[in-house]
Amino acid sequence: MGKKEKVNALEFSVNKGIFTKTRLKSLYSDFTSLFIKNPEGFLANVNTWREAIETSAWSGKLNSRIILVFDETFESAFSSPALGRPLSLGAVAAYWIQQGVWLRKQDFLNDCKKGNLVREDGFSIFSILRWSFQKLGFQNQASSILSNRSPSGQYVIRKNIEKLACLVHNEAMRRCSSYTSAIYTWDFFQDTFGSLYWEEGKLNKDEMECLLNWMCYQKHVLIFDSKIIKFLPNSQIDAQLASIDKSIDGSVADLIQARASIAQRSEFLNEELEQLSQVLNQAVKKGEKTIAITYLRRKKILSKDLERKVSSRLQLDTIISNIDNAVDNKILLIAMSSGSEALDAILAQMGGTEKVEDVLENVNDTLARSEEIDATIQTYNPQNIDLEDEAVEKEWQDLVAEEQKVEDIVSTLGNVSLKTPSDTFTLTNTDSDKKTSKPEKIQAELVEQ
């Protein structure tokens, strides 16, 4: 990314709420001694500075979004009219470099290629070794922090480069609908993603190198060489898709770059034609015939040039489309070949049609024998088993009659009063002789029985 005009990263950090006015004096003071006297206070300050630096870089307030250079320009970006320049930036840089959060560019590239990098919140054998060396005294952590000297060289911000790589990859996958749409030249890559994610339009050589190495060796989402950048598909069907073919991919890259150049030129011609139309209309209104004719001739020349550009682009689109179709057919052929091999293997395991016929014949024989056995069992009925035997029927009728008799007796008793006549009322001798209640008669009969 090219150099930007001076911006006040301090004001940006205050507006974001990263720096609070109550803490500014402490943040801009020399707090290196807190590393020993008050470790918690030191850690609070360096954490705040880290957030301010990384956020300012990502938002374009520093010279790069992903690489830090602790030079005069960097310090000026955080200068304060009231407090001057921060006095502990050297200690802040030394601390986060030792923590592996900001990595020297060459170390970053080497670790990417070796696969040594992990997430900042993760563990690896290398982080364990670094911690062990610090404990054993092989690294004098305190001396570099207390010296408060700004380190030289370029340092990669891991958090920011991972964020940028994620955005670029997501956009590339959104655009990737065919084989050729995954291939970029370096310039086409810059033109495609630059307008979206870096306002300057171009990543410088160092930034491109860091970004591509991270995405290639650490995230495994693309491959690249000095000319071609190729995003990898999510599913690997053909090994060719996961490698750069110098002849095929090189030709595709040339076609894509040519199409992009023609599209850019066509856009410029359209804008120029629109301007000429406006000027021509003004000349016609003013009656300036000579000027109007000049503009009209110029417009016709540009219109023919635009037609040629459109025709050329259509030809390139046709070639690119045919390449995509050929690749699709190749993938389809590979899939069909794999399916045919799988089908052959399954048929071989089945033993051919003769074995299938033998199996089916055995199945039919087994079913026939099973049906014969079932029919034999169903027809079996010994002579001494007779469910309609007269003795059984007579015994059943006797049981029913006995049950009915019991129910009648219970029903009759339910209607008999157990009270004596004296308990209810007193009858005269005449009435007693003349009338006897029906319940009493039934009760007397039952007693006699």
Swiss-Prot record:
The answer, when asked if Cytoplasm is one of the entry's keywords, is yes
Task: Specify residue ranges for compositional bias: Polar residues.
Answer: 421-430
UniProt keywords, alphabetically: Cytoplasm
Q: Which InterPro entries match?
A: Snf7_fam
Segments of skewed composition (Basic and acidic residues): 431-443
Give any Pfam family that matches: Snf7
Q: What Gene Ontology terms describe what this protein does at the molecular function level?
A: membrane grommet activity
**Effect of loss of the gene:** Suppresses slow growth rates of spores and severe nuclear envelope (NE) morphology defects of vps4 mutants.
Gene3D superfamilies recorded: 6.10.140.1230
State the residue spans of region: Disordered: 421-449
> Which GO terms of the cellular component aspect does the record hold?
cytoplasm; cytoplasmic side of plasma membrane; ESCRT III complex; mitotic spindle pole body attachment site; multivesicular body
Q: Does the keyword Cytoplasm apply?
A: yes
Which cellular compartments is it found in?
Answer: Cytoplasm
Main location, first listed in the record? cytoplasm
GO BP annotation list: intracellular protein transport; late endosome to vacuole transport via multivesicular body sorting pathway; mitotic nuclear membrane reassembly; nuclear envelope organization; vesicle budding from membrane
What family does the database annotate? Answer: Belongs to the SNF7 family.
Record's function text? ESCRT-III-like protein required to recruit the ESCRT-III complex to the nuclear envelope during late anaphase. Plays a role in regulating nuclear envelope (NE) morphology and nuclear integrity, particularly during spindle pole body (SPB) extrusion or insertion through the NE, and perhaps during karyokinesis.
Give the protein's recorded name.
Charged multivesicular body protein 7
Gene symbol? cmp7
